[in-house]
């Protein structure tokens, strides 16, 4: 076992998601179920994320990621198709001891998220440890 399975309480906790496409959407929808306080940084948003923004379920900054964007999130998710941005997000978060997940890049992650089966009150996460 290379990773320790853990469930984290994100209720009203700040989470930063970098990216505004379909991959980011999937992560954000899971974070919304966890009642996290989500900030999204992206150059553009998919239709569904614009809808969540309109409903004030997410806070959005239409801009490029910068190192100083990492102010107090409890975790960070990079969900962009830009390898340089993903690497910068990972290095910056790790330097600040903020847990970071870079989608589809396990070598840049300090945590991974398993596949989830939610049959409330039963919640099951399954992982191949990034493989």
For the regions a protein language model found, what residue spans apply to each?
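Adenosine-phosphate binding glycine-rich loop
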Residues: 116-131
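Hydrophobic beta-strand scaffold residues
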Residues: 38, 60, 99-100
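ADP-ribose/adenylate-binding Rossmann-like module
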Residues: 75-81, 86-111
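Alpha-helix C-terminal capping/helix-to-coil transition sites in glycosyltransferase folds
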Residues: 12, 71-73, 119
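A generic structural signal for well-ordered alpha-helical segments
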Residues: 53, 58, 89-93
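Hydrophobic, well-ordered beta-alpha structural blocks that scaffold small-molecule cofactor pockets
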Residues: 1-52
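Short loop/edge segments at beta-strand edges and connector loops
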Residues: 42, 60-64, 104
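Glycine-rich, highly charged phosphate/nucleotide-binding loops
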Residues: 54-71
């Amino acid at each position: 076992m290379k990773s320790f399975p853990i469930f984290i309480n994100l209720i009203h906790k700040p989470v930063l998601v970098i990216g505004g496409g379909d991959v980011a959407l999937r992560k954000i929808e899971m974070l919304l179920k966890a009642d996290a306080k989500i900030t999204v940084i992206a150059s553009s948003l998919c239709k569904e994320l614009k809808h969540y923004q309109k409903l004030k379920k997410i806070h959005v900054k239409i801009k490029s990621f910068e190192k100083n964007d990492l102010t107090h999130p409890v975790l960070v998710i990079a969900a962009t198709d830009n390898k340089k941005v993903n690497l910068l997000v990972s290095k910056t978060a790790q330097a600040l001891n903020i847990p970071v997940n870079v989608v589809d890049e396990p070598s840049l992650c300090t945590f991974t998220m398993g596949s989830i089966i939610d049959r409330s009150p039963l919640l099951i996460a399954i992982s191949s440890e990034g493989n």
